[in-house]
């Protein structure tokens, strides 16, 4: 199953490399696009759940790494939740 990584820039300028167990993340994000914080988290949540389910269909178990990545994204996003103007930039899809 092909994995995909995506690099994001958080509202404070820090960057993070993120993991997806499936290329489905490419259907939810466009490199160079900025997303409102809540929209970014929802897209990541849906993409990572779909990717995890694809792993389940193929191997019989969900992808714990996808759920770990989602937890990291949600924790990082929480830091900026009080800023209604917060945006996340998807730097690149790898």
Predicted segments — roles?
Residues 1-94:
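Motif-centric detector for short Cys/His coordination patterns
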């Amino acid at each position: 199953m092909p994995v995909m990584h995506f690099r994001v820039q958080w509202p404070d300028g820090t960057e993070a490399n993120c993991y997806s167990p499936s290329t489905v993340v490419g259907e939810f994000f466009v490199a160079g696009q900025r997303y409102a914080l809540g929209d970014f988290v929802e897209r990541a949540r849906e993409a990572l759940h779909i990717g995890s389910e694809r792993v389940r269909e193929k191997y019989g178990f969900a992808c714990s790494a996808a759920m770990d990545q989602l937890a990291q994204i949600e924790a990082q996003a929480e830091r900026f939740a009080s800023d209604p103007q917060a945006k996340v930039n998807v730097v690149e899809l790898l």
